[in-house]
Amino acid sequence: MRTTITVGIAVLMLVAASSARYVVSREGTHSAATEFAPISRLMNDAIAAEKLPGGVVVIGHGGKTVFHQAYGSRKLAGEQGLDGLPAPAEPMTEDTVFDIASLTKPLATATAVMQLYEQGKVALDEPVQSYLPDFNAANDAERQRVTVRMLLTHTSGEPIDVDLADPWGLGRADKAEGIHRALTMPLQSAPGGVFRYADINYILLGALIEKLTGQTEDEYARQNIFTPLGMTETRYLPAASLVPRIAPTAVDDQSSADPGKNPHFGVLLRGTVHDPTARRMGGVAGHAGVFSTAHDVGLFAQALLDRLADRPSRFPLRQATLAVMTSPQQPGHRPGQVEAANDALRKAAATTPNTMDPLLAPHYPAIEGQELFGFSWDIDTAFSKPRGLIFPVGSFGATGFTGTSLWLDPGSDTYVILLANAIHLRGSPPISALRGDVATAAAQALRL
């Protein structure tokens, strides 16, 4: 039986507050009337509170797109237009192209690694140095213990990012330098012992993909993931023709102490990846760099759910592989951890409700010290707020720094996408709570 978590009073009030009904179906048919007005209220209130300039929400359920709506602005008034001069605001549209930031990890890199796993070219518990010898050129005993599994689950001991203090890659992109720095950064903790979300892990996985395939990651992902799924507007290095529809992020502020070392200093990033490491590497890296639309991310999500459910699907991995990829895979994972986490959430909701703010009642993770992570997919960690209150532990998702998120629940055959360029609004607070609120409202609207 699917686990259901008791919902706080605030959620019930949120849903009851609106009588408007919205139903969208890509097949052009109407499903049972479903109240999605609370999602619009959440998004519009967040925009009014200057938490983000705008965004696009897509909800899939039962094999259909049941909600697809754009909100707010794609570009704020007074920010640089396509000609680099201050320009009027641009409305957000459903077909806006976003820098999806770390959603690159599951949509491109981890999927590619698991394809290589299916082909017998990668073993999950093989040391990284077997594929990338320069990872351990000095034959260090600790580095020898780092495996592909540890990179995929952020348990390698690597620090969060490479050193960006000097201006490497600013005047001219230098991917080789970025990979070299990732290969040689000292470990911050013992391999397999600590969950630390680190971009270095996926920079290394990107390098592994390129070495084993002989292709750049953008070429590989386009041919083997995006094209088979029909994701025609998803790619690294977006074409110039897409730029008018791309949501700008922030101005390039790298080398602020000496702007003369960065020829793009002060330029609004639009069609150029925001992540500074990926940008210095030329826009193609394992941890960030992909641009996409909410529609295309929905194609990926629906194909994934279809494959897991053993329905006809073009998803480029086998069902068994996906089942592994989307379940706890961190070193030391064991049966029963997901069930224990859901039990803990039920008990917390029943015995220690947060009466000041019911939306914050759950703990993330549900059990302190038990962080559950699949291969690129968050299951129950400190980053799991986009799950909301109703989807159980065992559902999974991912987020991107620019303001993007995707959460999927195979148990209810549902996915929730929120794509935004939150960082375009300078100084705006994180939108972690908004992501969770939207997921909760979506699940409640679907009567899950």
What feature does the model see in each segment?
Residues 124-139, 227-229:
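Short, glycine/proline-biased beta-turn/loop segments that scaffold the active-site neighborhood
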Residues 422-434:
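A short acidic/glycine-rich loop-to-helix N-cap element
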Residues 1-4:
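Positively charged n-region of N-terminal signal peptides that target proteins for export
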Residues 32-98, 121-123, 138, 180, ...:
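Short, conserved catalytic-motif segment at the N-terminal edge
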Residues 289, 395, 402-415:
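Short, surface-exposed beta-strand/loop micro-motifs that present aromatic residues
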Residues 37-44, 57, 63, 99-125, ...:
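Active-site SXXK
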Residues 75, 139-393:
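Short, surface-exposed loop or secondary-structure junction motifs
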Residues 12-30:
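Bacterial Sec-dependent signal peptides at the C-terminal "C-region" and cleavage site
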